[in-house]
Amino acid sequence: PNLKSRYLLGRRAAKRTDVAQKLIGEGKFDQVGYIAPLGKMPFSEQTQSSKEGLVSQMSKMKEVIEALKQDKTSLVAICGMPGVGKTFLAEQIADQVKFEKLFDEVAKANLSQIPNTRTVQDQLAEQLGLKISEETDRVRAERMYTRLSNGEKRILVILDDVQEEVDFKSLGIPVRGECKGLKVILTSRLSHVCSRMGAQIFEVGALPKEEARHLFKEVVGMSDDSTLSDVSDQVADECKGLPLAIIVVAKAFKSNHTTPESWNIALRQLKKYTMRDIEGVQDLVFSSIKWSYDHLESVEAKSLLLLCSLFPEDYSIPFECLVR
């Protein structure tokens, strides 16, 4: 893509938006119409092909939702190795419980490697419509606690990527039965950390072989009777059932390989990529991402990806930073 032309187009669009907003402000309109955004499709209404390819995830999702329905359960944890789909599963659960009207509100915060109490509170407060930006730590926690425990609404809080014990008191999150209307979901690769917090653990494992192959073909856009079906199954098997690896590799194959010969060459290359002794990085996840990086179409795309990797985890990267 031509980044310069995209940047210029974006600037023109921003200027025209400012002009439109000014005209709206100066006009005497009783109402200004906007196209309503499309809501997320609940998991139960997704396409049949997707559901067939995610049988194990749907089963796990139902288990977690059943636990959330129990009065005695206030804290659950979705645990598993990196790339297995913990965050995706938590988000699907959030969509489904809202669709079923089990909860009135859902708020999610990313904890990442170095969780900051105020940052986590700000993420939750924004989604809950709570203003706490100018308060002291103690007052912020009290206001968050009051918002979550007033009993007027059923609230689901998701804390993603937990790597150490969470100080719920400092955050202002009532747990362990303090509020019947509040439930908390943790996602973490460290089940022992979640166990120490008293969470009910739900382990998420790799996809069974047939589900993994189905997901790979679905991402590539390939039918079972394709001439590439056999080699695609071998590629999918190399991903060892990890959804992240499957999706990353499948997208790269979809873009760059169209013949059995090119697929076989790429398969041999994929088998060579390994990485060891880096905490929190599975060999397979790294090899899949490294392989897909090497198969990006241009040096410009590779440079952009490397630039993005310099920013902190979960950082919202301004577009302008990428085109300077």
Language-model regions: role of each:
Residues 1, 6-16, 20-23, 27:
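Amphipathic alpha-helices that form helix-helix packing interfaces
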Residues 1, 43-44, 50, 55-56, ...:
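P-loop NTPase nucleotide-binding module
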Residues 26, 79-81, 109-114, 162, ...:
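Structured beta-strand/turn binding interfaces of compact recognition modules in eukaryotic regulators
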Residues 157-159:
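Hydrophobic residues in beta-strands of the RecA-like P-loop NTPase core, especially within AAA+ ATPase
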Residues 19-84, 88-97, 101-105, 110-113, ...:
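N-terminal flanking helix/linker immediately upstream of nucleotide/cofactor-binding cores
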Residues 163-171, 195-198:
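Conserved ATPase-coupling elements of RecA-like P-loop NTPase cores
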Residues 118-127, 180-234, 248, 265, ...:
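Alpha-helical sensor/transducer elements of the RecA-like P-loop NTPase core
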Residues 21-35, 116, 175, 179-180, ...:
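Proline-centered turn/helix-capping motifs that create local helix->coil transitions or kinks
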